[in-house]
Amino acid sequence: MLFFLCFYKGFCTINPEEDPNNIVDEMLFEIRAVQREYAIKRELIFLHLQQANSLLQNAKTTDEKVDLLIQKDAFSTELEFLKNSELRDISKIRYIKGLQIIKLLYEKTLSLDHHFAAVSTLRDVNNISNPNNYPEFVEMKDKLKTTQDKRTGFDLPSLLNSNIYTSVVYSFVSMFTNTNTSKAEKDNGLKEVECILDFTLRMHNDLNTIYFETAFLQKKNENISEAIKDLFKEYTKPLGYTIGLEECRKGDDWDAIRKNLDTYLATLDKTLEDNSKLDAARNLQINLEFPVDRLLQFITEYNNFINEGVNFYEKFQIMLSSYENEKQCASKTPVEYSRLKEGISVTIEKFNTAYKPVEINGSKMKQLLYGINEYD
């Protein structure tokens, strides 16, 4: 059967930019294939049952009637077996595809962490938001210090000297009160740093906001990552698999899960063959099915986080684009600023494509998890 060829694809290497909705569609296709296959088998048995009923009505001898009743009972038993076998095959599909989704979403959280780390480096944000990190401003301060009146001037303590606001105020006060520097020298000095001061004073708060809110998103991503680890532990527990998701990924131990699943399914198949153990078989099937509420809860949590991330980064994009004198001060604007803008644009695109939410509506989820078709 075609769908069985796809069963173990979820254990192969996954690209973190793969769309989880493709996995959902594959799951839906495979479940429908199973349902069609078993529907054909049931139709054949129902046809045999109808024939047996027709023959039973016309049977004249006791032996004929007994034989036909035995046939009917065998057909009913076969129908029950088909029902349990169908549940078993659908449960297997759900389990493997669910594990594939878990694995993919974990890869996405790891990839997201790299994006956040690239934006939220405090050193980089501090470098472009504080004029004290610009050589031109440092040079101007040094000149003011060497030309100031030693009797009336004063030096800022190192702590205040590194502060953007006290450092700028001190520099302006020193410049205006410095009688050893000509007006032309002061004008030239201001001209050298005007774009630096304009950019840092206007963008300092916005850049810090971007840093701290990105750190907040990074923390939430860590929480999502921990939640999916817990889900994986709960998910593989019925198979007797005890290794955590992170260790499984690092050790590429997916084949061990496949072997545990094969063993579990072999036990289920053996139990299904014994009519006296149908309740036990049903329990084994239930344990293999998706932990529905837990999985739905996580998918909802992941989707909300991605949507929140898009909103945050679109706000960052607006904040960075709000610098009014960007064209006028293009030659003095730090290259890190342009890189930050580009990085945020790329991240927005990533959120909308590589990290986009898992689109599972109510009717689709019912069919995927319970085999219920809204058109049945």
Annotate the PLM regions.
Residues 1-376:
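Extracellular, luminal, or virion-exposed ectodomains of exported proteins
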